[in-house]
Amino acid sequence: MFRQLGFVACALVVLAATSVRSLACEGNEVIFEDRFSDDAGGWAINNAVEIKDGTFALKLAPDDLETNLNVTFTVEDADICSEAVWPEGDPVTLGAGLLFWGVDNKDYFQFGILNSGKYWIARKQDGKWRTIVENIDFSAINTSPGATNTLRVKATGNTASFYINGTKVRDLRGQPPKSGWRFGLSGDNFDKEKETKLVFKSVKVTN
């Protein structure tokens, strides 16, 4: 997520939000599916990542952002879904996100939700953040500690559609990479004192 006070205008058009209901990942062909029974799914393994017992966990230090683009799969048109679980206990301000239209760790788009009931869309370009949609309230987000939320991005051509728990949020027109792109996960810890852990239960990609 964009983590600076100043916001930079992004030359993309965001269409009006809707309340259309839609099932997750409706494509006919499953391109990728990971329920995290092992760590062989092509994710970047480092000290901030823990994959075991059917979960993908991002360990988040205070005031930390962790992103993880899948290394071994490249897609074009794709429907991406993931289940994110807020940690139990006293909540810190936390964000969970899907990455799409990714080239590398310096260039990708991010769709995320906060455990305060807001969502955002941002772009990282040449290592710099640009906010597209900034922290919009959305009642479909489950905010309770331990609650699960399903995030979905359906990217077709130059249009991406965003869903939270089956409810369509909005569309976005942009410029995807020309020769395929990568997808991934992200976690944001906005507490400046407490560390935490964000868990994802699955990732599925269809076309």
What residue ranges belong to the model's regions?
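Extracellular carbohydrate-recognition regions
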Residues: 25-45
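Short, aromatic/His-centered strand-loop micro-motif at the edge of beta-sheets
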Residues: 127-150
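Short tryptophan-centered beta-strand motifs in secreted/extracellular beta-sheet-rich domains
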Residues: 36, 80-82, 146-156, 160-162
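Short carbohydrate-recognition loop motifs
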Residues: 48-66
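Secretory/extracellular carbohydrate-interaction modules
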Residues: 61-125
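Bacterial N-terminal signal peptides that target proteins for export
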Residues: 1-9
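Flexible glycan-contacting loops in extracellular carbohydrate-active proteins
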Residues: 172-199
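Extracellular beta-strand elements of beta-rich domains used
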Residues: 36, 201-205
